[in-house]
Amino acid sequence: SLAVAVGNAHGAYVQTPNLDFDRIASLRSALPIPLVLHGCSDIPPEQLQESVRLGMSKFNIATEYFRACYHGVVQHGDPAEKNGDMFRLMMETSENAIDFVRGKMRLLNPNKFTF
């Protein structure tokens, strides 16, 4: 596989990114290997869907995932009060993490996954 730069970047965006769909299509037609898009957090859903349509194979969405997990912890009180209890932290983040992953799976492969 090949990770490509087409308007994406790691971490949080200062402004809404605009993916270069012409470049994605051009790379897809020129290369016989799967294309990977890093830095997909906060890229608008319609841009991710268009990337799928153009042949993008894999999407890395860590920042947005971590944010969803953090919100799960915060919903259950002050994270500082957890005293480093990782089991408790993981249990508190699991519902948010699962919901986030399911949502992205539905977005990127709407005909393949049902939950």
Task: Locate the predicted segments by residue.
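Short, electropositive alpha-helical surface patch
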Residues: 21-26, 52-60
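Catalytic cores of alpha/beta
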Residues: 40-55
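Glycine-rich phosphate-binding active-site loops on the catalytic face of alpha/beta enzymes
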Residues: 6-10, 54-70
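Hydrophobic faces of well-ordered beta-strands that scaffold small-molecule active sites
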Residues: 2-4, 35-39, 57-61
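Alpha-helix-loop-beta-strand connector modules within alpha/beta enzyme cores
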Residues: 16-37
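Glycine/Thr-rich beta-alpha phosphate-binding loop at enzyme active sites
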Residues: 1-22
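Extended, intrinsically disordered, low-complexity segments
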Residues: 74-115
